[in-house]
């Protein structure tokens, strides 16, 4: 693996849409007892279910720490590759590389700096040095050269692209004090355009209500295909989420993408508010410097946090009446894909969902 002193734009590489073909998918095995309840055992079962669902559509690699390797290997099917890799937590969407491709089919990784969603300002845990090495290690495993941006903080869950020059993100996240306070909005745009080969960036204001990642876009918005997008929605005007989703809808409805297309926006209603129970709260170890999980806290639940695989869509189930409505809507949006629901409350309790725990490798 080479570290290349250049940029995607200079070298003719672009970030493809997630709906384009994949060579495979990465997942990190959860274990932090101060984030995942009951020693991460319930979460591990949910991660197995996600990995298994995706493995029916494309190759899956699960990376696990040395102390969890044997356990992960035992719990996962033989079709899933398990590799030992140090990590601080299980959010490979954010700590892993953002892959870019060229017209010849070559793939490279963009290795952003990772600081646990806000560093010493409002990061979620410390230290995060193992997570900051995950992208490089995955590039090594995949034998892909990389671009390394040691001075630019970004998480993969904070961006979505259409593969044709347009990126969508949120001001709440990318302009937050804990990311790149030394850079202006225009300077941040310049970096993204240079390393992902973009022509236009659409800025939403905020992400899902109470999203602890400072409003990652992948929990509120997704690209179905170029020009067609999905948005988390609620019809309950008394819910704080309504104002946020309405604001996003208004922005998207009045924007055009890099190709000059008006966006076709499809709403997918979120479940009813999901709160942490007393039992769930007590199952998480209390550690200074880590975000606590308190009884009654509202979780940032959204069906938009799904993963698009080769011929499949893997989406979260919450035990809510809207589960089936979300399935129907996703099947309409992806008529040529098999839509698979996976029970995801245990992942949600850790602070994210299916899209957050996955990272695709394009081909």
Curated annotation (Swiss-Prot):
Top-level enzyme category: hydrolase
Pfam family, one: PAD_porph
Keyword ATP-binding carried by entry: no
GO molecular function, one term: protein-arginine deiminase activity
Enzyme active site: 356 (amidino-cysteine intermediate)
Reaction equation(s) it catalyzes: agmatine + H2O = N-carbamoylputrescine + NH4(+)
GO BP, sorted A to Z: putrescine biosynthetic process
EC number, UniProt record: 3.5.3.12
Superkingdom per UniProt: Bacteria
Listed name of the protein: Putative agmatine deiminase 1
């Amino acid at each position: 693996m080479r570290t290349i002193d250049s940029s995607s734009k200079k070298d003719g590489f672009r970030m493809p849409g997630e709906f384009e073909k994949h060579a495979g998918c990465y997942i990190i095995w959860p274990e932090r007892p101060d984030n995942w309840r009951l020693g991460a055992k319930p979460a591990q079962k949910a991660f197995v279910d996600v990995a298994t669902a995706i493995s029916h559509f494309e190759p899956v690699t699960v990376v696990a720490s040395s102390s969890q390797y044997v356990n992960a290997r035992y719990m996962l099917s033989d079709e899933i590759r398990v590799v030992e890799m140090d990590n601080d937590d299980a959010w490979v969407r954010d700590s892993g590389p953002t892959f870019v491709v060229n017209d010849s089919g070559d793939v490279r990784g963009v290795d952003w700096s990772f600081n646990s969603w806000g560093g010493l300002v409002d990061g979620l845990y410390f230290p995060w040095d193992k997570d900051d090495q995950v992208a490089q290690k995955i590039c090594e495993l995949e034998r892909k050269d990389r671009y390394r941006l040691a001075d630019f903080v970004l998480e993969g869950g904070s961006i979505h692209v259409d593969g044709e020059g347009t990126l969508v993100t949120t001001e709440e996240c990318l302009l937050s004090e804990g990311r790149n306070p030394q850079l202006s909005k225009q300077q941040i745009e310049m970096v993204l355009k240079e390393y992902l080969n973009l022509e236009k960036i659409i800025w939403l204001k905020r992400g899902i209500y109470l999203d602890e990642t400072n409003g990652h876009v992948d929990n509120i918005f997704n690209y179905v295909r170029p020009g067609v997008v999905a948005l988390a929605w609620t019809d309950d005007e008394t819910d704080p989420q309504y104002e946020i989703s309405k604001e996003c809808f208004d922005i998207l409805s009045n924007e055009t993408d890099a190709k000059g297309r008006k966006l076709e926006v499809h709403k997918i209603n979120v479940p009813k508010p999901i709160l942490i129970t007393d039992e769930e709260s007590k199952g998480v170890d209390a550690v200074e410097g880590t975000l606590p999980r308190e009884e009654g806290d509202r979780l940032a639940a959204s069906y938009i946090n799904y993963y698009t695989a080769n011929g499949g869509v893997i989406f979260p189930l919450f035990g809510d009446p809207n589960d089936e409505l979300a399935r129907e809507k996703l099947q309409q949006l992806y008529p040529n894909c098999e839509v698979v629901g996976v029970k995801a409350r245990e992942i949600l309790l850790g602070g994210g969902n299916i899209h957050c725990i996955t990272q695709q490798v394009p081909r």
